Regions:
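N-terminal beta1-alpha1 cap of cysteine-dependent amidohydrolase-like domains
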Residues: 2-227, 233, 243-295
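Catalytic His-Asp charge-relay segment
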Residues: 235-239
Length: 295
């Protein structure tokens, strides 16, 4: 393998001659950052994780471990050291919240770990995708996200970019999976903000240097937003759409409001395509050497 000169990118030294990581565990644990409960529901403040995220991870052969959003720095570090990957879920949390602060602390840990040769993958869905997009800008403020129109309940096929077929995430996907994702209404969007493709691919920008855009979609106002991307130098993966919902959530507003559109999201092909993405992430987590201390 040709060995290139190490390159300075966003403060990280990246060596192109590093050997690809291999599988080191058959018992991966995915840390999921729990969110604060909705104060409008009343009662004491608690934390929660939507069950479909846990089910999706378990379906792909991993275990899920909650990481509390209000953990101390020491507790976040201890949790990070024991899990093999991090899942950032969807939600509607302010970027000025304690949850968002914990998110960025964990992402900095993941970046530092990978820089040090400690392989650690991250997946972000919807809000998690948006947080990872922001992280790629190199700063927590100001927000790089823009409003999207008509994307609450939008179920559409993906528009793949020229990078999709050669990406780490999709290069091993079957022709059937790629066809399902690109030709059928299977990706479930539930968002009012997004990372616009123009911003994430602008030449010379920190975002374009950090991420490779794999797929986009267009909102009702004609704005093209990023739907799927992966880190160029880090095992970070993001989807604006909710892949966990196809197999595990039923009779939700996004399908009841448009039953014809929602029906295709539950086909066997749709479920298989989303499980491919989840299983890929878990396969990445199997390369992490972190050890769950309860075993």
């Amino acid at each position: 393998m040709r060995c290139l000169r190490p390159t300075l990118l966003l403060g990280a030294i990246i060596s192109a001659c590093a050997a690809p990581p291999s599988i080191v565990t058959s018992r991966p644990v995915i840390g999921i950052l729990a969110q604060p409960s909705d104060p409008d529901l009343g009662g004491p403040e608690t934390s929660y994780i939507v069950a479909s995220y846990v089910k999706s991870i378990e379906q792909s052969g991993a275990r899920a471990a909650p990481i509390m959003w209000n953990s101390s720095d020491a507790e976040l570090s201890a949790a990070f050291s024991q899990v093999n990957g991090l899942l950032l879920t969807g939600g509607h949390i302010s970027r000025h919240s304690g949850y968002s602060n914990s998110t960025f602390k964990l992402l900095r840990m993941a970046q530092a770990a990978n820089d040090a040769g400690d392989f650690f993958p991250v997946w972000g869905t919807c809000q998690g995708h948006e947080q990872l997009a922001q992280f790629g800008s190199g700063q927590q403020e100001p927000s790089i996200l823009k409003p999207t129109a008509g994307t609450e309940g939008l179920i559409v096929p993906l528009n793949f970019t020229e990078h999709a077929s050669s990406s780490r995430l999709l290069s091993a996907a079957s022709a059937e999976v790629m066809s399902t994702l690109s030709k059928h209404k299977v990706t479930i969007n539930l968002h009012s903000l997004g990372a616009l493709a123009a911003d994430m691919t602008r030449s010379g920008s920190a975002e374009a240097a950090f991420y490779r855009v794999l797929a986009t979609n267009t909102d009702s106002g004609g704005s093209e937003f990023v739907s799927l991307m992966e880190g160029r130098a880090y095992p970070f993966y993001t989807s604006q759409f909710h892949g966990e919902k196809n197999a595990f959530e039923w009779n939700q507003g996004w399908e009841l409001n448009n039953t014809a559109q929602g029906a295709e999201a539950h086909t066997a092909e749709a479920v298989a395509a989303m499980q491919y993405l989840s299983s890929f992430f878990v396969s990445e987590a199997r390369k992490s050497p972190h050890v769950w201390l309860a075993e």
